[in-house]
């Protein structure tokens, strides 16, 4: 149960007061650096003039406020945010070792976070799938000495299961930066994307690779409009073809000049049949080379069907001059491959060419 003082502070924080009350709010403990602290009555999130903004769709601003208060060693605000419902464990993750025992005592005899619990919290924050969650995760875990005891294999496994993209890096900090950046790009959290890119300009290649891998052509379009694309369209196609059903990214690469034949061949190597037929629908025609590649990777049914070249043709319903992301997504919303359907019908009519594994 909240104390009377804590409850009173909460009521005051939920109301906007004029600047005439600034001195009172400072004395009342509802002040953070350059402005008063507010608690949104609608979304129940906390924000202040400098530190946070209110996101009605996100649910972690209060915990983010706690982490920032811990990093600035503001004990009064730490107590206040915990009383209001912030998870004290999230704060303990960011406490310098010399202050850990003191803060555990202040928060009612809590024990330091164990390694297993640390990894569980990392999963919890990643699973929030919110802009505020991504930014909080970065704030909590990057440059965090507690992770020094976690093996690289364990950390890589946890991050891969959440991001679904292979991560590489010389340090835990770099790995975690790329991890949270990848999550922001996967879900197109624009605010988080811009925050990471502003802090890590050297990660342009990673931003581009993730946008292609996660089919995020909104971000690709932004990079193109700012003329920040740093690699060739065919190399971009290589990233787009890594993941099945990345139709929008493949289409966008083709609009930039990537060859649909190259995309078709990459899709065969990656065993991504749907991407393969999408490239044929876009106009891929070099079936002689595709047949050789399919045979080389033991995809004998594909190799056989490519002998029937007259079966395939470009899908005229895929308009080839759209560059606006939403228009591309809308066009592909009802897309099904006509060439894949023809291939399936041909196999049904000619079972003698089907190779049973």
Curated annotation (Swiss-Prot):
GO terms for biological process: symbiont-mediated suppression of host cytoplasmic pattern recognition receptor signaling pathway via inhibition of IRF3 activity; taxis. It is found in: Host cytoplasm. GO terms for cellular component: host cell cytoplasm. InterPro entries: ASFV_MGF360. Keywords: Host cytoplasm, Host-virus interaction, Inhibition of host innate immune response by virus, Inhibition of host IRF3 by virus, Inhibition of host RLR pathway by virus, Viral immunoevasion. The keyword Signal does not apply. Interacts with host IRF3 and TRIM21; these interactions mediates degradation of IRF3 through TRIM21 and ubiquitin-meditated proteolysis. Belongs to the asfivirus MGF 360 family. Plays a role in virus cell tropism, and may be required for efficient virus replication in macrophages. Also inhibits the host cGAS/STING-mediated type I interferon production by inducing host IRF3 degradation through the proteasome pathway. This is Protein MGF 360-14L.
């Amino acid at each position: 149960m909240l104390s009377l003082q804590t409850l009173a502070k909460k009521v005051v924080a939920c109301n906007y007061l004029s600047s005439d009350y600034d001195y009172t709010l400072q004395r009342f403990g509802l002040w953070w650096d350059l402005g008063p602290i507010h608690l949104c009555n609608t979304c129940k999130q906390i924000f202040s003039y400098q530190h946070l903004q209110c996101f009605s769709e996100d649910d972690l601003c209060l915990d983010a406020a706690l982490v920032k208060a811990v990093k600035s060693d503001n004990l009064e605000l730490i107590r206040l945010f915990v009383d209001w419902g912030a998870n004290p464990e999230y704060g303990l993750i960011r406490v310098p070792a010399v202050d850990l025992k003191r803060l555990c005592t202040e928060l009612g005899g809590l024990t330091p976070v164990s390694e297993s619990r640390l990894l569980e919290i990392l999963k919890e924050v990643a699973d929030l799938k919110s802009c505020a969650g991504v930014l909080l995760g970065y704030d909590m875990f990057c440059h965090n000495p507690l992770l020094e005891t976690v093996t690289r294999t364990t950390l890589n496994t946890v991050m891969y299961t959440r991001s679904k993209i292979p991560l590489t890096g010389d340090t835990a900090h770099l790995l975690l930066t790329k991890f949270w950046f990848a999550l922001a790009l996967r879900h197109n959290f624009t605010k988080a994307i811009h925050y990471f890119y502003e802090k890590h300009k050297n990660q342009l290649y990673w931003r581009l690779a993730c946008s292609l891998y996660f089919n995020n052509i909104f971000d690709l379009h932004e990079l193109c409009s700012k003329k920040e694309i740093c690699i060739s369209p065919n190399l971009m196609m290589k990233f787009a073809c890594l993941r099945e059903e990345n139709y929008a990214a493949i289409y966008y690469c083709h609009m930039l000049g990537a060859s649909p034949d190259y995309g078709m061949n990459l899709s065969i190597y990656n065993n991504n049949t749907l991407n393969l037929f999408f490239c044929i629908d876009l106009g891929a025609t070099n079936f002689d080379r595709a047949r050789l590649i399919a045979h080389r990777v033991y995809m004998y049914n594909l190799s056989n069907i490519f002998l029937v070249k007259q079966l395939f043709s470009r899908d005229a319903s895929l308009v080839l001059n759209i560059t606006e992301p939403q228009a591309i997504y809308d066009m592909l919303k009802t897309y099904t491959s006509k060439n894949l359907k023809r291939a399936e019908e041909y196999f049904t009519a000619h079972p003698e060419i089907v190779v049973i594994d």
